[in-house]
């Protein structure tokens, strides 16, 4: 039987802080396929997330198909706005939400993994990171600072992670990021430079696939997922309207589930996808294929 088999693999999923988003669903799918999973979580949300896990508040979401319970090998602090500890402003490093976490940068996360597991330490890296501080603003009203912040965290951080984790990933490793159709089409309401960030993310994926493939033999892909009513997506402000629009116009009118994206990510990280790199895979019930409204 042909199956996704990730036994013996270790994955890092960056950008998980609750049980409602794509990152959590991907982490769960990877565990279901046999991988061990470490998480990178935004420092201000880390304590709350660990408390939810420890107190059993999200136990229903942790249930696995085989009757077991989802467990993470490690949960590390990560703020993908910073490439190295030197990039973290002093006032941020000394703030209440950061001061007890040490080096929260991408390089700091890489160092923690090496300290815990040696080199090489991972097989799979998932980038489920995005932040647009001005996402509710139209592009015409977006500041330079807000625009660059969106691109830095949502797109450049993928290049930074591939650069830093590429040497720490076993040959034939897989990198996967998450994008959205606003990279290709105009989506009113998805502002603050986030559409530009997603376009950059998809463009970078193609070049990273070439560079990481030639340098280390790794594959680099991105999933363009449909809208999901996650806690993170609520920041957009029009997410429910976007979901309703997709259900009305997509070839498959059912609402997209996070688990469907998780399954595709697990496939892309597996040997079954060994010939796929530099690709943008749409998981959106076919909405991306449409050029007009339904006839009836």
Predicted regions and their residues:
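Canonical Rossmann dinucleotide-binding motif of NAD(H)/NADP(H)-dependent dehydrogenases/reductases
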Residues: 3-47
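Aromatic pocket-lining residues of Rossmann-like dinucleotide-binding sites
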Residues: 30, 212, 268
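A glycine/serine/threonine-rich, flexible loop-to-helix segment
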Residues: 50, 54, 192, 215, ...
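Conserved mid-core segment of classical short-chain dehydrogenase/reductases
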Residues: 51-150, 167, 183, 189-190, ...
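Hydrophobic structural elements of the Rossmann-like NAD(P)H-binding subdomain
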Residues: 13, 126, 176-178, 220-223, ...
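Catalytic loop of short-chain dehydrogenase/reductase
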Residues: 15-24, 42, 130-215, 224-230, ...
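Phosphate-coordination loops involved in phosphoryl transfer and adenosine-cofactor binding
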Residues: 7-10, 172, 252
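C-terminal helical subdomain
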Residues: 104-108, 156, 222, 240-276, ...
């Amino acid at each position: 039987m042909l199956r996704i088999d990730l036994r013996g693999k270790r994955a890092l999923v960056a950008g998980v802080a609750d049980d409602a988003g794509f990152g959590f669903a991907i982490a769960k799918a990877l565990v279901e396929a046999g991988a061990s999973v470490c998480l990178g979580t935004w420092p201000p949300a880390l304590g709350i997330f660990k408390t939810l896990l420890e107190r059993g508040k999200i136990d229903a979401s942790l249930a696995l198909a085989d009757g077991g319970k989802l467990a993470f090998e490690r949960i590390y602090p990560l703020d993908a706005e910073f490439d190295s500890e030197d990039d973290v402003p002093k006032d941020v490093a000394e703030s209440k939400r950061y001061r007890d976490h040490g080096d929260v940068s991408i390089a700091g996360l890489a160092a923690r993994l090496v300290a815990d597991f040696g080199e090489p330490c991972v097989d799979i890296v998932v980038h489920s990171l995005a932040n647009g501080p001005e996402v509710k603003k139209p592009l015409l009203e977006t500041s330079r600072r807000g625009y660059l912040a969106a691109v830095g965290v949502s797109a450049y951080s993928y290049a930074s992670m591939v650069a830093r984790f590429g040497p720490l990933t076993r040959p034939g490793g897989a990198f996967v990021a998450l994008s959205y159709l606003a990279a290709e089409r105009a989506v009113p309401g998805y502002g603050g430079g986030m559409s530009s960030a997603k376009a950059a993310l998809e463009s970078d994926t193609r070049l990273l696939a070439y560079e990481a493939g030639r340098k280390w033999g790794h594959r680099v892909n991105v999933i363009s997922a449909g809208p999901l009513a996650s806690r993170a997506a609520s920041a957009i402000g029009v997410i429910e309207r976007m979901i309703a629009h997709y259900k009305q116009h997509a070839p498959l009118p059912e609402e997209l589930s996070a688990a469907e994206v998780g399954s595709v990510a697990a496939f892309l990280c597996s040997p079954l996808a060994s010939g796929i790199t530099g690709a943008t895979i749409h998981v959106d019930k076919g909405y991306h294929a449409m050029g007009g409204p339904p006839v009836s």
